[in-house]
Amino acid sequence: MAEVKEEQPKRFSLWNFWISSLLLKLLLIPDYYSTDFDVHRNWLAITNKLPLRQWYYEHTSQWTLDYPPFFAYFEWFLSQFVPSYVKSDGCLDIVEVGQFGMPTVVFQRLTVIASEILLFVVLQVYINTSKVSERTQSFVVASSIAISPGFLIIDHIHFQYNGFLFAILIASIVAAKNKKYLWCGFFYSVALCFKHIYLYLAPCYFVFLLRAYVLNLKDFKFKSYRDLIFIVKWRHLVKLGSVVIATFAVAFGPFIFDLPQLLTRLFPFSRGLTHAYWAPNFWAIYSTIDKILTMVFLKMPYTYKLASQFISPPLIPASLNEIKAKMAANNNGSKGLVEDVYFVILPQIVPKLTFLLTLLYQVLAVVPVLFDPSFKRFMGSMTLCGLASFLFGWHVHEKAIMLVIIPFSFLVISDRRLLSSFMLLTSAGYVSLFPLLYESQDFLIKTFYTYVWCVIYFFAFRKTTRLSTSVERRVFFLDRLTLVYMFLLIPMVFLIQIRDILGWKYLVLQRFEFLSLMVYSFYCSVGIISAWFGLSWLYNFDEPLWVSNE
């Protein structure tokens, strides 16, 4: 009889993805870089040249150190490998404005590429620790993150270290999936000590670890109030608390006498509501409406008279002269300045309001985790916590959309009903990053790479995600509307590029210089907010979707 060969399980490796992406990243070394490049160069200089206690006081340059201590230690570590010819190029000079050449550019670009190896390693661990039946899905998720357009645009052209930082966050996600709760808490604490933007995810981590690891609700039976002491697994609480406290002690301990100064650097509340380029969130729509109303009222005064009959001050300016005075005196958000934004027509927004809105929607996201601390619920809660902070937060950067896309990538494979929201979020989110690369030389790379990624992975996710288990296929809005929105992104991007190219030639186009950024912000915010609505509906009202398969 012929020997029957056992079918070997498929091997899913990210090695080929790393090699191919490495070649592209090396080609991008001499490309455009943003002011963030000099920011990190200055941080290299500060951590290399100054004593540790002076790191958060140094202000020769406007690019002061404003990341948590672990990232400062990371910059110090990188500075130890700066070659002598790069030092002589000005890489480690503490100056007001950096003066450097190609040696510094090459060195810093290579540090980003080298540090991103951790991302590929963590994603490979995610694949290898998945069940054999889930390896294909895990591979799609891991590869989509590994070659994400977001990391290419933000890290390898614009210049940051997000791939390395998100690797640590993903390590905590992988630990949670494998029920390694102490490692989950440890890696999240480390990530938080590297970049404080991860603080937005703290509510979902706190509730998840509390419910899954610390509280003993499964076997708990209430007979008297004395029994409440047994609801807590005290040993687990001590171990988890020790891990978290020890991590923060290592990070912040050397700065114990300078914590007030450090905190003022980490949380500069003097910044305005919106960034120079409006992040595509709720406040982008709010700002756009204010801008349109201002133009309409000034161009067509009768519309103001009509509106003032139904709306009275302070909800609307008392007169057209007041509108003109506000336009002349304040930054109305259309100048591309990073400072306090004052709305001309609509009521002003204060930090307290943005905090309350963010907190409200984050609380709604974490409550279900108290009753069902499954990995699927955890990922849904993390995605919605990220969305709440992105949509309603104060001074949100467009790059923060990665805080939403990454956890959603781990969630979407669980059910095809999530795919419409995911496609909306990723397409709008990645396109919203295009203004970061405003030079014409980068137009083809950012558009072609992003569109190819979208086509490949939208089909891959559709093929590998689980089919809906409920009888009624409740999909947010209509899949066709999602496709229409996504296809309209293509002409929007090309028309804006044409306007930018012709803007210097025609005076009429120069009068609408900020129109391109406004269209990007407004249209992408519509897609992201729609994705939030869709995911929120499924998260709160489609119970069969969240039935745990663990």
From Swiss-Prot:
Its EC number is 2.4.1.265. One of its GO terms (biological process) is protein N-linked glycosylation. Keywords: Endoplasmic reticulum, Glycosyltransferase, Membrane, Transferase, Transmembrane, Transmembrane helix. Residues 1-11, 131-150, 211-236, 299-352, 414-417, 462-475, 535-550 are lumenal. Pathway: Protein modification; protein glycosylation. It is a multi-pass membrane protein. Residues 33-109, 172-189, 258-277, 374-392, 439-440, 497-513 are cytoplasmic. It is an enzyme of class 2 (transferase). The chain crosses the membrane at residues 12-32, 110-130, 151-171, 190-210, 237-257, 278-298, 353-373, 393-413, 418-438, 441-461, 476-496, 514-534. One of its GO terms (cellular component) is endoplasmic reticulum membrane. Its main location: endoplasmic reticulum. GO terms for molecular function: dolichyl pyrophosphate Glc1Man9GlcNAc2 alpha-1,3-glucosyltransferase activity. It is found in: Endoplasmic reticulum membrane. It holds the Pfam family Alg6_Alg8. It comes from the Eukaryota. It catalyses: an alpha-D-Glc-(1->3)-alpha-D-Man-(1->2)-alpha-D-Man-(1->2)-alpha-D-Man-(1->3)-[alpha-D-Man-(1->2)-alpha-D-Man-(1->3)-[alpha-D-Man-(1->2)-alpha-D-Man-(1->6)]-alpha-D-Man-(1->6)]-beta-D-Man-(1->4)-beta-D-GlcNAc-(1->4)-alpha-D-GlcNAc-diphospho-di-trans,poly-cis-dolichol + a di-trans,poly-cis-dolichyl beta-D-glucosyl phosphate = an alpha-D-Glc-(1->3)-alpha-D-Glc-(1->3)-alpha-D-Man-(1->2)-alpha-D-Man-(1->2)-alpha-D-Man-(1->3)-[alpha-D-Man-(1->2)-alpha-D-Man-(1->3)-[alpha-D-Man-(1->2)-alpha-D-Man-(1->6)]-alpha-D-Man-(1->6)]-beta-D-Man-(1->4)-beta-D-GlcNAc-(1->4)-alpha-D-GlcNAc-diphospho-di-trans,poly-cis-dolichol + a di-trans,poly-cis-dolichyl phosphate + H(+). This is Dolichyl pyrophosphate Glc1Man9GlcNAc2 alpha-1,3-glucosyltransferase. The lineage of its organism: Eukaryota, Fungi, Dikarya, Ascomycota, Saccharomycotina.
